[in-house]
């Protein structure tokens, strides 16, 4: 349970809390898309077409999700072809930022779900963003890649997006019953300090099941611990975004 589960459920929580929210799925696996959009294959316009065509009519690519108040720009497998295409373009890192320019002030929050690798699609997301939320699973191995990500963020700030900041570190898949889980949380807090969100996402059967049923936690188990915790995280995000 990591970035896609977090992006989907935080977007859903923000919408449920009354914030106008847009979720952008940039991952070729399209897990966010299939979890909150009915019959996504019936929609012709995806993020791939938007970025390839450099169409400035971004509203034509925004569709309604199964979560009230949550809008989506969908992804599909064709996004995998975008990586080599953008690598050969002078403006390759800026396509997403340019595409979102007309609607940035239209939404309270625009959440971007990224691929699992630090390729040019993820770099597009970092260039287009004001802030980044980093989910870290409650295990020692999950800390290993954090240094590379933070180094990439620093490079992006210096070269392309000086306003980019780390909004927070979200601990997920936490087992409160084990000493190991407690030790990892302590380690993460020692490394990242006040950047760590107060709310910790517990390991949960419902949270692990919801992607298999192609749903967010709010449509699959709206009264579960996972839903309550993600809503608490969303409230923290609203506060931090104001600062």
Stretches with model-predicted labels:
Residues 1-243:
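P-loop NTP-binding core
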